[in-house]
Amino acid sequence: MSLEAIQFDRSHRDDISVRVLDQLLLPYTTKYVPIYTIDDGYTVINTMQVRGAPAIAIVGALAVLMEIQLLQNDGFARTQTFYDISSFELTRSALSQRLDFLLSSRPTAVNLSNALREIRVLLAQSAGLAAFGNGVYDFVCRLIDEDLTNNVKMGDNGAAFLLDALQQEGFDEDFAVLTICNTGSLATSGYGTALGVVRSLWNDSLAKSQAPGDGSAKKRKLNQGRAKMVQVYPLETRPYNQGARLTAYELVHDQIPATLIPDSSIAYRIATSPVPIKAAFVGADRIVRNGDTANKIGTYQLALVCKHFGIKFFVTAPKTTIDSKTETGAGIVVEERKPNEFKHVSGTLIDSQTGLPCVDNQDKPVSASVGVAPSEIDVWNPAFDITPHELIDGIVTEDGVFTKSASGSFDLTNLFA
């Protein structure tokens, strides 16, 4: 069974439905939240019920599509104070304001901005609501389908690049990799970005371990070297614990050998790992022209530690994450989250005697929030940090892996189209 962050039922074009997995309840509770309006999309994005730059863009675009579907019901439109449907020009103006509102849900993630920019173009070009709805529908379907295809390409590109580099170094042993936050099926339409590379590395390891004559499904080797990834170290990724709650959940689901580690243990884990750690693969919420990258808080320090130990550090993201208008990381607006998201820890209540989740009278796991810091203490809680391009060894995309020139700079112009 594949993991799904987004359920988009398009079997009936005139009656589509969207549900989003509430990732705040994982790993013990699986609950899908229906999306009917832009307000619903804003809420699940802003509260981080859905996260991951590609998934955020998809959910945002789907929320617009769902609101259009409701707008075409005259009764619904007349109940909304922000719409005047007496003319499409007035509706167009209101929709433009609604897109502004939706964009404010997570301003750092460039994928959402890019998707809404495409929708604005469609809005400007459409002669009426029906034409606009058809255009958005086609765009959303293409966005989802291309994301999944590109994720598999990225996974294989990043895995093959690392394996080839290790072969050129003469390294032919088992190895481990690091990752942070969640960049897998739960952050995308499927397979993942950085975690997609991990999936491809694991498939390669299975292929190299497959005995001749094995009757099981044949796996595909990504290169002819003997190096195999045998261990993944996901960081817990405080304060939202996406690594612990989500990435660990995906790795267990896919039966990929993994050991969850504290954010503060990176250096010591590298120094003491029973198998050598040869690379770190991370995702991105925004990559600017020079290669500086905004990603989950903690990515910068992971890159610094990798630099110290000589470990390859790769950013993995689709071309839609490239911001061709911003020159350097200094131009990225970093979102800051509410203090209580740092001072409180939320999760499923566990019975101290049995170690099992506590359940309510409907046999559903009970969620709880506990304080871990004085309520009076000041808090700085940035959602992202900026990793300088100098610390990045390669940027993995669906078009291949981009590395730095002899001068130490990235040339990403081929990705700006």
Curated annotation (Swiss-Prot):
Keywords per UniProt: Amino-acid biosynthesis, Cytoplasm, Isomerase, Methionine biosynthesis, Nucleus
Coiled-coil features, chain-numbered ranges: none
Alphabetized SUPFAM superfamilies for the sequence: NagB/RpiA/CoA transferase-like
EC number(s) on file: 5.3.1.23
Reactions catalysed according to its record: 5-(methylsulfanyl)-alpha-D-ribose 1-phosphate = 5-(methylsulfanyl)-D-ribulose 1-phosphate
Transition state stabilizer, annotated site positions: C181
A GO BP annotation: L-methionine salvage from methylthioadenosine
Alphabetical list of Pfam families matching this protein: IF-2B
Record localization: Cytoplasm; Nucleus
Primary localisation category: cytoplasm
Catalytic residues (positions): D285 (proton donor)
Gene Ontology terms, MF aspect: S-methyl-5-thioribose-1-phosphate isomerase activity
Domain of life: Eukaryota
GO cellular component: cytoplasm; nucleus
Pathway(s): Amino-acid biosynthesis; L-methionine biosynthesis via salvage pathway; L-methionine from S-methyl-5-thio-alpha-D-ribose 1-phosphate: step 1/6
Record function comment: Catalyzes the interconversion of methylthioribose-1-phosphate (MTR-1-P) into methylthioribulose-1-phosphate (MTRu-1-P).
NCBIfam families, per database record: eIF-2B_rel
PANTHER family per record: METHYLTHIORIBOSE-1-PHOSPHATE ISOMERASE
Family that this chain belongs to: Belongs to the eIF-2B alpha/beta/delta subunits family. MtnA subfamily.
Protein name per the record: Methylthioribose-1-phosphate isomerase
Organism, as annotated: Lachancea thermotolerans (strain ATCC 56472 / CBS 6340 / NRRL Y-8284)
